[in-house]
């Protein structure tokens, strides 16, 4: 009887020890990550179907998500540091020049204008980073019935003047009374990003169009600039990405955040968006929204 008891006790111990392996592995992995900040570590366990193995699998999935967030934050820090370095260097150089070398008020004024311009660039960059962070955090937008046609008409009026000042032809063809469910401020921001992009790169003309079908509203912004290669077309929605082409040469191309912001706004509205372009043939940015009947909203 004592032998049988000891055997049962031993079997129970082994069973409990084996059952607790996933817990021990999770604890060990969590401690290693806490000490090393290495989010690439995972729980290495043989396949199993019990609850603890399922928990270990969920733990690994959580680590996958944490690693993506961690890498994204590292990349954002690197990108922001890079983007801020140039304007800050210019500001410091111009400040030193104005203080030590400028011989007259005119030279000092030129330096101050450069400093002011670069300071505004930094402010704009920070504002866009904060806006993108809020969008990526998935904050809830207040969506209501809005008239997309009216939004585009207002923007068209503004950009017609801006295009004219640059010697560009601006045309628009906007279908009337296109009603969608959305946030008016965010939709205006999306279209404004498309239009400011076109204003920057167009050679002679910009087109703003809105067409409707039975269920969809399709807006598009075309320019006749240098265009975008197929490779770049797949990447331009990424943060801080700027196409490496003649499109960017000799131009102050901005922060590289405008299209990333537009992509997040479209996602929050359940809208499709994309670009049609090829190098040397201009670009057409588009977004497609589902139409609604405001009387039923």
What are these regions (language model features)?
Residues 137-142, 179-182:
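Conserved micro-motifs of the catalytic ATP-binding
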Residues 24, 49, 53, 144-160, ...:
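A conserved beta-strand-to-alpha-helix junction within the catalytic ATP-binding
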Residues 205-215:
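Short beta-strand/loop element within the Bergerat-fold HATPase_c
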Residues 204, 270-271:
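Conserved glycine-rich
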Residues 198-199:
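Short helix-loop "hinge" at the ATP-lid/N-box region of the Bergerat-fold HATPase_c
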Residues 44-46, 144-145, 164, 169-179:
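Conserved catalytic submotifs in the C-terminal HATPase_c
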Residues 1-80, 84, 89-100, 104-106, ...:
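Membrane-proximal HAMP signal-relay module
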Residues 223:
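Acidic ATP/Mg2+-coordinating residue in the GHKL
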């Amino acid at each position: 009887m004592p032998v049988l008891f000891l055997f049962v006790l031993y079997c129970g111990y082994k069973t409990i020890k084996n059952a607790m392996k996933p817990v021990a592995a999770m604890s060990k992995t969590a401690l290693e990550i806490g000490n090393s900040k290495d989010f690439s570590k995972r729980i290495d366990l043989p396949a199993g179907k019990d609850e603890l193995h399922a928990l270990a699998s969920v733990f690994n999935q959580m680590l996958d998500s944490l690693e993506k967030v961690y890498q994204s934050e590292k990349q954002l820090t690197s990108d922001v540091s890079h983007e801020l370095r140039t304007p800050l260097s210019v500001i410091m150089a111009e400040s030193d020049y104005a203080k030590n070398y400028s011989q007259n008020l005119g030279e000092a004024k030129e330096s101050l204008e450069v400093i002011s311009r670069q300071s505004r660039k930094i402010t704009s960059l920070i504002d866009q980073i904060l806006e993108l962070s809020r969008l990526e955090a998935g904050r809830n937008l207040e969506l209501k019935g809005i008239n997309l046609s009216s939004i585009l008409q207002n923007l068209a009026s503004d950009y017609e003047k801006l295009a004219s000042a640059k010697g560009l032809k601006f045309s628009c063809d906007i279908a009337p009374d296109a009603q969608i469910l959305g946030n008016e401020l965010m939709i205006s921001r999306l279209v404004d990003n498309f239009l400011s992009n076109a204003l920057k790169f167009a050679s002679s003309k910009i087109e703003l169009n809105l067409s409707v079908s039975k269920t969809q509203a399709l807006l598009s912004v075309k320019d006749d600039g240098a265009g975008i290669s197929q490779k770049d077309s797949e990447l331009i929605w990424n943060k801080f990405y700027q196409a490496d082409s003649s499109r960017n040469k000799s131009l102050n191309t901005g922060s590289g955040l405008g299209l990333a912001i537009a992509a997040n706004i479209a996602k929050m509205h359940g809208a499709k968006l994309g670009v049609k372009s090829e190098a040397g043939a201009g670009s057409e940015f588009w977004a497609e929204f589902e139409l609604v009947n405001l009387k039923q909203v």
